């Protein structure tokens, strides 16, 4: 079954990918006209535009469950009076995901491809294999990706096989004597390398690296990652924050559009929490649910059908004993 095509030129939604159709959509992208729309329509359109770029590999309920209303920012100095773009931090909680951080480190051409690397067991976190693409990285976590898989994902050339095998195939000689002699020489060289503890490195075995076309548009590394391309690993230093006039969350959309998306998600979050509270009140009575009100079995709180005579006697009790005579 053919996969769904995510780079529609008609819809023009942006994706975190190096695909040529996505780059074309970025080049001709225009902000949606929200003048003659209601407030809810503005929020919905802003959510649709920003949601396609931030976390397209997630379902809507997954993003709503992981949404964090708290937006983090820092002030560098008192002299810098530029406003802090807090609203651009709406999707900052997605940047700590394992698959998204691999894409930001330029080890995969898209977030979906980074997720595929994690599911196939090509990623190690702190020296241990990790198959959960939704894992939230903590500051100081070391992520290592398989080098050959990175070359297959990032390089445009299909000839990424080791050069040792290519050398064996190209150095074939018609005579059997020449083949035996060269095989012996190669075996002796490999034996010397292994005995001395020197194996061919990844730079020597992999053919020439050819970057993918249109890669330069997204070839940047955020400030919260420290990347080492020689070992295909990176360190998640800290969570992204907003500074005066600067945000560390990469996004092609302005702050106003992120503000509308933030109000949409914060409204849906409050509605879900309110519905959960109402459901809890309907299912569990307040006197049974709260320990301060509970003072016995539930039968004590059920109302009894009392006759008016009994109610009057309870209100105005009559002394049953006889009065003593006064002498």
Swiss-Prot record:
The protein in question is named Small ribosomal subunit protein uS4m
Indicate, by first and last residue, each region the UniProt record lists as having compositional bias (Basic and acidic residues).
Answer: 174-186
Where are the compositionally biased (Polar residues) regions?
156-173
User: Region Disordered: which residues?
Assistant: 156-199
One MF term in the entry's GO annotations: structural constituent of ribosome
Q: Where in the cell is it found?
A: Mitochondrion
Q: Which GO terms of type biological process are on file?
A: mitochondrial translation; ribosomal small subunit biogenesis
């Amino acid at each position: 079954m053919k996969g769904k095509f995510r780079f529609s030129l008609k819809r023009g939604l942006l994706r975190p990918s190096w695909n040529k159709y996505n780059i074309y959509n970025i080049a001709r992208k225009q902000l949606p006209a929200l003048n003659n729309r209601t407030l809810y329509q503005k929020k919905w359109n802003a959510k649709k535009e920003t949601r396609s770029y931030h976390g397209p590999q997630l379902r809507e309920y997954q993003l709503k469950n992981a949404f964090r209303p708290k937006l983090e920012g820092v002030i560098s100095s008192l002299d810098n009076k530029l406003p802090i773009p807090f609203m651009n931090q709406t999707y900052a909680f997605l940047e700590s995901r394992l698959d998204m951080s691999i894409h930001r480190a330029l080890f995969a051409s898209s977030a979906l491809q980074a997720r595929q690397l994690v599911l196939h067991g090509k990623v190690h976190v702190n020296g241990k294999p990790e198959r959960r693409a939704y894992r939230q990285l903590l500051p100081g976590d070391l992520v290592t990706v398989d080098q050959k898989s990175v070359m297959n994902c990032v390089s445009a050339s299909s000839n990424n096989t080791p050069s040792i095998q290519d050398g064996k195939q190209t150095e074939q000689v018609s005579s059997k004597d020449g083949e035996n002699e060269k095989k012996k020489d190669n075996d002796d060289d490999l034996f010397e390398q292994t005995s001395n503890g020197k194996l061919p490195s990844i730079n020597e075995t992999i053919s020439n690296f050819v970057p993918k076309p249109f890669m330069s548009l997204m070839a940047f590394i955020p400030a919260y990652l420290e990347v080492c391309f020689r070992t295909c690993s990176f360190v998640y230093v800290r969570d992204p924050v907003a500074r005066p006039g600067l945000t560390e969350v990469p996004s092609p959309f302005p702050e106003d559009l992120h503000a509308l998306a933030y109000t949409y998600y914060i409204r849906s979050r409050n509605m879900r929490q309110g519905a959960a509270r109402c459901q809890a009140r309907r299912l569990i009575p307040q006197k049974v649910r709260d320990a301060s009100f509970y003072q016995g079995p539930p039968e004590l709180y059920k109302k009894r059908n009392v006759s008016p005579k009994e109610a009057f006697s309870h209100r105005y009790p009559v002394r049953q004993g006889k009065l003593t005579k006064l002498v």
